[in-house]
C-alpha cells in the first residue's frame, strides 16, 4: 500500500513539473521565462534552459538581460555536450560583447 501511495505522489510531482515547464514556454512574461531559464540552468537542465534562452536572446537584444542570456545559452549547449553549437554561441558572445563580463571565458571555449 505504501508503494502505491508513493508512486502516485511521484507521478503527481512529475506531471506538475512538466505542466509548469509547458506553461512557462507559452508565457509572454519574458522576465519570468528568464528567471526559469536561469533556474533550469542552475539545476543542470540544460535542454530546458537552452529552449527558453534561444527565444530570449532575440527578445532581449539591446537590454540588460541580453549579455547574460547569450552566455547562458552557450553554456547550456556546452552542458548538453553540443560543443559545435556552444562554440558558435561563445563566438557570437565574444564578437558582440568584446569587453563583456564573460568575454575571457567565452574566448577560451570558442574552439572546444
Question: Which stretches of residues belong to each language-model region?
Answer:
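Short solvent-exposed coil/turn linkers within tandem alpha-helical repeat scaffolds
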Residues: 24-25, 59-66, 94-104
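Conserved small/polar residues in nucleotide/adenosyl-binding loops
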Residues: 110-112
Amino acid at each position: 500500500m505504501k508503494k502505491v501511495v508513493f508512486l502516485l505522489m511521484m507521478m503527481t510531482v512529475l506531471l506538475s513539473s512538466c505542466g509548469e515547464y509547458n506553461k512557462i514556454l507559452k508565457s509572454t512574461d519574458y522576465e519570468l521565462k528568464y528567471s526559469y531559464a536561469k533556474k533550469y540552468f542552475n539545476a543542470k537542465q540544460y535542454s530546458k534552459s537552452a529552449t527558453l534562452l534561444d527565444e530570449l536572446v532575440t527578445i532581449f537584444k539591446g537590454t540588460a538581460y541580453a549579455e547574460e542570456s547569450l552566455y547562458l545559452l552557450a553554456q547550456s549547449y556546452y552542458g548538453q555536450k553540443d560543443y559545435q553549437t556552444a562554440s558558435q554561441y561563445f563566438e557570437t558572445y565574444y564578437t558582440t560583447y568584446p569587453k563583456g563580463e564573460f568575454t575571457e571565458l567565452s574566448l577560451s571555449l570558442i574552439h572546444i
